[in-house]
Amino acid sequence: MVRGMRTIPPMRSESLAFLRTLLDTPSPSGFERDGQRKWLEYVRANGATRTWNDAYGNCFAELAPTVAPAAGAAPFTVAVCGHADEIGLMVNHVDSNGFVYCRQIGGIDPASIVGKRLQFRSSVPGVTQPVIGLIGATAIHLQDRSGEPKVRKLHELFVDIGAKDEAAARARLNIGDPGTFLDASMMLTDDIIVARALDNRIGTWVAAETLRLCAQQAERRVRVVAVSTVQEEVGLHGAEMIAESLRPDVALVTDVGHATDSPGITQAQHGQFKMGNGPKIAIGGAMQPEVVARLLATADRLSIPLQRGATPGSSGTDTDAIFLAGGGIPCGLVSLPIRYMHTTVEMGALSDLERIPQVYAGFCEGLTGGERFAPTL
């Protein structure tokens, strides 16, 4: 393996194996079951005192405080959240020649998926293995090049599963079957990882790793609940559900953010964020200022660099749903800077990623359980 520019010890092998298991388990929005099962297995083996899930598959792992709250008082609850789902496609139509047409699950640039391989989870009785297909591309020799190049829309792209006709295709796939891109995770260097679903399997990984680190603390006065939410890519739906049911005192959310250090990105417009220079902390908008200040202080105490990101409005993450619940839940958002978001080659640095649960665990350890995150007016 090519050596990168890692300045901290290598990631714990069990943690890296768990991350790659999450990354390589198909979990499109609305069909997160397989990935959620892997997540629950890990948290149950790494400190959770209780786990549960709701009707839509949001998963929770609780770690009770080591110091009980005062008699009759409910424990101060910190929710550490990330969404489990990824973008993908859903079977929408099968034509007479057996070609499959799809609708998108989440935000997809059609130009980025031509020629890509897919795996569909079939609901046809008796079909137990993934159905493999590819998004067909007309050979360059056969293209009409007389006018301007045509940018094809998603509904114009077809998936070829090797079926000879409509009946053969429908014997293997039903309308509504979900598909994900067939791209496994890989290490580009000893620090740089590439995967189709860093967005946002890294968020659920952070939640589980924070729980694991907190379980090792000698004393902790707060209840920590790691949460793996569903359906973020199609509307933050899981976050709305868990905010209403859990009502934490504080929520720490992790998602991916844009690294702006690759060609073609205007930093004056999008900010300056470099992969490998530390996680990105959001400032403004849904982020509660006292929570942000404590996260920054915790990172400083632990000598962990954070890149500040201006977020005056929507963050485009689960934070936007959680902070509105229950009259306002104080939130913080720390993201992993990645390149090539919403493609099959999302790229990030492990050295950035593993610092996020370290900050969160330090944040939880420093709480007394009596905090009230609100401005002094």
Please give the residue ranges for each predicted region.
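N-terminal hydrophobic/helix-forming segments and targeting peptides
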Residues: 1-377
